[in-house]
Curated annotation (Swiss-Prot):
Cell compartments where the protein resides: Cytoplasm
Keyword match Coiled coil: no
UniProt-recorded name of the protein: Exodeoxyribonuclease 7 large subunit
Record-linked NCBIfam families: xseA (TIGR00237)
Catalytic reaction annotation: Exonucleolytic cleavage in either 5'- to 3'- or 3'- to 5'-direction to yield nucleoside 5'-phosphates
Record family assignment: Belongs to the XseA family.
Keywords attached to this entry: Cytoplasm, Exonuclease, Hydrolase, Nuclease
């Protein structure tokens, strides 16, 4: 008679087979994502085709490394290992890597990241910085061996020889290139004497240019203190670095031209033009002054200068005569007023006037004293009355007469309304405070 196996024994045996099978250690699988709902850490979903379904698990560390957003219904290529879960006896694939299926995988990744960054405001015009009109020092983040730096040096030297160019060498493609580009941009921003940055590389495939589509590079350009001009690939190539940069140039030469908007020839032409304008303006001013001088020489004032002050002499004589008449009239008026005052003073008995005013002063003093006494007595009576009223309201005097003050939650209680059994009250008495609990409430008239 054959021995019967337990379910757990069989499951352990199958798990051992799964774990030891080299073909299940690394499985390359294509399937459609199903039952996907993003979770905070590890991700659990299914992969299916038209005939079968397999459960899939992706740990948080691997999921964070994905360069695209996993979506329901997306067809993906995954790499992982197959394992058996003993408690349920089901098998699943532990996904280590994943990418969209088909030749458009990078395009999908590009569009997803572009949408994400756009919604976060990375590409908004309000964040764009202006390119300075005049620069003294330009930083260039690119490969030291490519044609980019040579084209930029040649163009800048031709357009404005005095501008200094500082190269920040970096990898522009391959593993780790994106992180190195981002770090180099941050390093360039530490240079206080730089006016702007040119970030770029020459042409290549989408894979070659992909470092400039990485989120870390976009963030480094966005956070840059310095204005950034991007020059990645050829005119038909567009990367996310181009969207976030303050200006985008199709070629390194175009980037150098954007970095030096005003050339040495422009400045010399401007100076020459200003010199000519100043010269012509000076000539016109001199001619105008000469014409005015000739007209002045021909005027009557210069031919007969004595006529210049004839009118002033006549006006001075008139003013002198008016002053004499005015002083004489005022003196006569003063003398008349003095005579009238003298006559009035002679008709006044000064002693009697003084006696009358003295009597008035005495009466005013008596009236003032009487009024002040009356007002004082009245105010004193009102004060004493108010003082008595205040004293009667003093809580300490109230409790001294045998009364008590009752409060509930620091609020004065004057009626049984709102008081319930079990309430805690504070009773203030002459010599202390009682904390009491209400046992019964009865309403009675006193």
């Amino acid at each position: 008679m054959s021995d019967y196996l337990s379910v757990s024994t069989l499951t352990k045996y199958l798990k051992l087979k799964f774990d030891k099978d080299p073909y299940l250690e690394r499985v390359y699988l294509t399937g459609q994502v199903s039952n996907f709902r993003r979770r905070p850490n590890h991700q659990y979903f299914s992969l299916k085709d038209d005939k079968s379904v397999i459960q899939a698990t992706m740990w948080s560390g691997q999921f964070k490394k994905l360069g695209f957003e996993l979506e329901e219904g997306m067809k993906v290529n995954v790499v992982g290992r197959v394992q058996l879960y003993e408690p349920s006896g089901s098998y699943s694939i532990i996904v280590e890597k994943a990418e969209p299926d088909g030749i458009g995988a990078l395009a999908i990744q590009f569009e997803q990241l572009k949408k994400k960054l756009s919604q976060s405001g990375y590409f908004d015009d309000r964040h764009k910085q202006l390119i300075p009109q005049f620069v003294r020092k330009i930083g260039v983040v690119t490969s030291p061996s490519g044609a980019v730096i040579r084209d930029i040096i040649t163009t800048v030297s031709r357009r404005f020889p005095g501008v200094e160019i500082l190269l920040f060498p970096t990898k522009v493609q391959g593993e780790g290139a994106a992180q190195e580009i981002a770090q180099t941009i941050a390093l360039a921003n530490e240079k206080k004497d730089l006016d702007l940055l040119i970030v770029g590389r020459g042409g290549g495939s989408i894979e070659d240019l992909w470092a400039f589509n990485e989120e870390c590079v976009v963030e480094a350009i966005f956070e840059s203190r310095l204005p950034v001009i991007s020059s990645v690939g050829h005119e038909t190539d567009t990367t996310l670095a181009d969207f976030v940069a303050d200006r985008r140039a199709a070629t390194p030469t175009a980037a150098a031209e954007l970095a030096t908007p005003v050339t040495k020839i422009d400045i010399l032409s401007w100076i020459t033009e200003r010199e000519n304008r100043m010269y012509q303006s000076s000539l016109r001013l001199i001619r105008t002054k000469e014409e005015r001088l000739q007209k002045s020489k021909q005027s009557v004032i210069f031919r007969q200068p004595e006529r210049l002050y004839d009118g002033f002499l006549q006006k001075l004589d008139n003013l002198n005569q008016q002053l004499t008449y005015s002083m004489r009239d005022k003196l006569q008026t003063v003398r008349q007023k003095q005579g009238l005052l003298h006559q009035k003073l002679q008709g006044i008995d000064l002693k009697q006037r003084i006696h009358i005013y003295q009597e008035r002063v005495v009466q005013s003093r008596r009236l003032l004293s009487s009024t002040m006494t009356s007002q004082y007595d009245s105010k004193l009576a009102r004060f004493e009355k108010a003082q008595d009223a205040l004293i009667s309201l003093d809580s300490s005097r109230i409790v001294a007469r045998g009364y008590a003050i009752i409060e509930k939650n620091h609020t004065l209680v004057s009626t049984t309304n709102g008081i319930n059994e079990g309430d805690h009250l504070q009773v203030k008495m002459q010599d202390g405070l009682l904390e009491v609990e209400v046992k019964d409430v009865r309403q009675e008239n006193i």
